[in-house]
Amino acid sequence: MTLRLESLKSNKGARRRKLRKGRGIAAGQGASCGFGMRGQKSRSGRPTRPGFEGGQMPLYRRVPKLKHFPLVNPKQFTVVNVSALNDLKAGSTVSLDSLVKDGIVTSPKHPLKILGNGELKTKLTVQAAAFTASARTKIEAAGGTCELPE
């Protein structure tokens, strides 16, 4: 038997007819159309909105509002871990511009912050807006220095 376009058939049950509700008892979905007896969920129109608890005071209104949330002007940093600095040349000066040039950071939108995840084996002079305590100790233990911009 050759595979021809006119000999193709759908799998059994792949193409089902649309269920037509409310078209008589014999159709299988007549009378209450599968919505049960009475009540809000059997009525036409949209279902209740998310968070609606049937008239009871909903949770999002029972819980108090938090002061100063969300933060109005949160400090945002471009973060780089110490382990990412291992690939750089020893004795070089590391800044946000040099990291963008080397492809470690994609955009210089926010000031640079160095985090202390990983180990540092190369001696570097790192210029950043902020350092974590562990990052500062690891840079200085490798013989490097940490500099804050003016």
UniProtKB/Swiss-Prot annotation:
Q: Where is the composition biased (Gly residues)?
A: 25-37
| Keyword Ligase in record | no
SUPFAM superfamilies associated with the record: Ribosomal proteins L15p and L18e
**One GO process term, biological-process aspect:** translation
Query: Can you provide one Gene Ontology molecular function annotated for this UniProt record?
Result: rRNA binding
Task: Give the UniProt entry's GO cellular component terms.
Answer: cytosolic large ribosomal subunit
User: Looking at the keywords, is Ribosomal protein present?
Assistant: yes
Disulfide bridge map? none
Pfam families per record? Ribosomal_L27A (PF00828)
Q: Where is the composition biased (Basic residues)?
A: 12-23
Q: Where is this region: Disordered?
A: 1-57
Q: Which UniProt keywords apply?
A: Ribonucleoprotein, Ribosomal protein, RNA-binding, rRNA-binding
Role this protein plays? Binds to the 23S rRNA.
In the record, the note on similarity to other proteins reads:
Belongs to the universal ribosomal protein uL15 family.
Record's subunit section? Part of the 50S ribosomal subunit.
Task: State the name under which the record lists this protein.
Answer: Large ribosomal subunit protein uL15
